[in-house]
Each structure stands twice: as C-alpha cells, then as structure tokens.
Amino acid sequence: MASVAVESQPSVVTRVANLPLVSSTYDLVSSAYISTKDQYPYLKSLCEMAEKGVKTITSVAMSGALPIIQKLEPQIAIANTYACKGLDRIEEKLPILNQPTNQVVANAKGAVTGAKDAMTTTVTGAKDCVASTITEVVDKTKEAVTGSVEKTKSVVNGSINTVLGGRMMQLVSSGVEKAFTKSELLVDQYLPLTEEELEKEAKKVEGFDMVQKPSYYIRLGSLSTKLRSRAYQQALTRVKEVKQKSQETISQLHSTVNLIEFARKNVHNANQKIQGTQDKLYLSWVEWKRSIGYDDTDESHCAEHIESRTLAIARNLTQQLQTTCHTLVSNIQGLPQNIHDQANHLGVMAGDIYSVFHNASSFKEMSDGLLSSSKGQLQKMKESLDDVMDYLVNNTPLNWLVGPFYPQLTESQDAQSRGAENTTSPETQQPETKRIKPAPASSAWGSQSGDTSCTVATC
C-alpha cells in the first residue's frame, strides 16, 4: 500500500508549476517573450532556432536517461516525498503562493515590497532543494550512461580488432588486393596508355620516399575512370580507322570504275590505248594484291585476265564496303532517326553497287549509264559516310562506353569467322568484328533502343 501511495503522489515539480503564483508569472513571462519575438523578426528566428535546439537536446537526454531513471525510481520517489513535504510547509507559511500575480499586486503593492526578500529567500531555498535533488539524479544518470557507452565502445572496438586481425579477414584483404592489382594490369595490357597519360607519366619525377597505397575505394574509382577514358579513346580511334579505310575503299572503287569506263570508251580507238589501259588495270591489280600480302607479278596480263581481275577487285571492294555499311547499321542503335536513315541508305547503295559488279563478267556487260550512276552513288556514299562518322566522333557518350564492359565474340560471329577462314580466299576475306557488351545500365542513347549492345569493327 505504501508503494501505491508513493506512486500516486504528484511530482514536486508539477505542484510548483501548478501554484497560482508560479503559473500566472509564467503566463506573464510567456506573453512578454511572444510579443518580443513578434516585434523583432531577427530575434524571432534566433529564438526559434534556440527552441528547436533545446527540444532536440531535451528529447535526446530524456531518451538516453530513461533507463537509468527507471532504475533509480525508488530514490527519486523518496526525494520527491521530502520535497513535497517541504513544499507543504512553504505553502502553510506563505498563503500568497495560492494567489495569482494580478491579485497579489492589486491587493498588496506595498506588502509585496516588504515581503519580497522573505519570499525570494524561501523560493530560492525551495528551488535550491529541488535543483540539488534533480542535479544529483542527473549526475548519477550521466555517470551510468557514460559508463555504459564506454563499455559498449570497448567491446565493439575489441570485436572489430579481433575480426580484422583474424586469418579469414587477412585472406579476404589479400584476395581483394590481388584482384585490384590484376585488374589494373589487365587494363594496362588491353587498353594502353593514351597520349595524355604518357605525357603525365613522362613529367613525373620518381623520388626515394615510399608512397602509401590509396584505399580500395579510391583505387576502384580510379580504375573505373581509367577504364572509361581509355576505352573511349580506343573506340574513337577505331571509328576514325573505319572512316579512313571506308574512304580508301570508296576511292579505290572510284578509280576502278574510271579505269573500266576509260577502257570501254577507248576500246575501238586504238590497240595502243587499249594496251595502255590494260597495263594500268594490271598495275592496279598488282598493287591491290600486294596490299593484301600476295605478289603474283609473274601471272599473265592479257586482256581477258585483266578484265576478270579488275572485276574481281571491284567485287571485293564493294563487298568490303557493303560489310562496313551493314556493320555500321547494326552499331548505331539509339541514335537519331536521320542518322539511321543515312546509314540504311548507305547499305542500300552499297548493295546496288555490289550487284552491278557481281553480275558482270566483262566490261561489255557494263553500260556507260551504269558506270556513271555507280560513280554518283559512290560520291553520295562518301558524303553520307562522312556525316555518320563525324556524328559518332563528335557526339559523346558513345553507347558502348557505359558501365563495365568487355570485348567478346558472339557465338554466331565466332562460327562465321572460323568458317570464313576455311572457305574464303585471301581476296574476299572479311574483316573481324568484335562485340563490346555493356552492363545493363541506362545510356544517353541506349535508352531509346531495346538492345544496348553494339559492335565495333576492327577493320
């Protein structure tokens, strides 16, 4: 029953706050504080910030001290009992505490001045008594909380040091170190240094001080940046090489068509001119054979052989050009529609030119109009190819440079390349095509297409 009585007894702080004199004084102070904030906006913002800070600190302190207060509840209850008894005696001696401020001021202005010192002394004593009790409780709470925190920190630090010093953690750390080192070596092997990086390496001066290795996170970020930069430079170089070789192919085709046209126009003029044209065609054949690694200057160069070889050159060049155009069409997924249209038109024109030379067995089967239209198509192809390649070079990011990627041959391409090595001749061997497959990350271009992978021709 005693415990029930203690638990049901109100807190001394609540009783003091509920006293009419204290509550009315609080109302006056609160109204003055609010009016001051309303009159001075800058002071209002500072006061609001202070209020939020006090509320936050109080909530944190209460949440942290609540378990300790619950443990010390019997002692706090005893202190509260003594404080309440003291407050009862004060209320008996000072009935003015039960009167509001306005009434006290109205009824006894003069008495207030005389009793000010006595009341101040009494209130100060009660406040000191309550404050000392609360201070003791808070100090005990702080000590208990601080001790618990220090013990927890020591246990956690000991556990972490034990885990980090264990053999398993050392094996994991060693494995991560080897993986990073191997990845950096592979990047340097398959993606060589760019010119800018070579210049930076040349400017570096090696000292004798040991340089501390950066953390794993810094090395991972540096590896990702290096991989993207070098892959972009390599892809850019390949695009430029494809552009240059395509232009060379078109130029060779243009020269071949001019030679065929010249031979057709002068076939009835004179045998000497025919012989000169045949010599030019034969030299073109020999030069082309040497460019692919074969030297057959001892072969016969009669008119029939010259015509067949010239047509073979034209067929091979148009086939290479057609392959390049088809590869280009498959590589520009996600680009603007006008670039798609130009690339598709390139493929159509390349197919038309290939059909012209594929179906012809001699110069006689090729009319002047057919040769003129072929030259016009070659000129249009050169312009369109320049536009598409310039767009690829000058508009980044390229959609094969997103996320972790690695070059690999697809199964169909691998089988096709192995079959081509066994069945095709050196004159008609096709360029190798590699696939660069990005991770399924969204790209600035790839988001418009369902397939984010693309191939880069290495020809």
Curated annotation (Swiss-Prot):
InterPro entries: Perilipin (IPR004279)
Bilayer topology annotation: Peripheral membrane protein
List of residues that carry N-acetylalanine: 2
Residue list for modification Phosphoserine: 215
Keywords: Acetylation, Lipid droplet, Membrane, Phosphoprotein, Ubl conjugation
Recorded superkingdom: Eukaryota
An example Gene Ontology CC term for this record: membrane
Post-translational modification: Acylated; primarily with C14, C16 and C18 fatty acids.
Location (main, coarse): membrane
Region called Disordered, residue ranges: 412-459
Record SUPFAM superfamilies: Mannose-6-phosphate receptor binding protein 1 (Tip47), C-terminal domain
GO BP annotation list: cellular response to glucose starvation; lipid droplet disassembly; lipid storage; positive regulation of triglyceride storage
Skewed-composition ranges (Polar residues): 412-431, 444-459
Protein family membership: Belongs to the perilipin family.
Subunit structure: Interacts with IRGC.
Function: Structural component of lipid droplets, which is required for the formation and maintenance of lipid storage droplets.
Protein name: Perilipin-2
Natural source organism: Sus scrofa
Lineage of producing organism: Eukaryota, Metazoa, Chordata, Craniata, Vertebrata
Name of the encoding gene: PLIN2
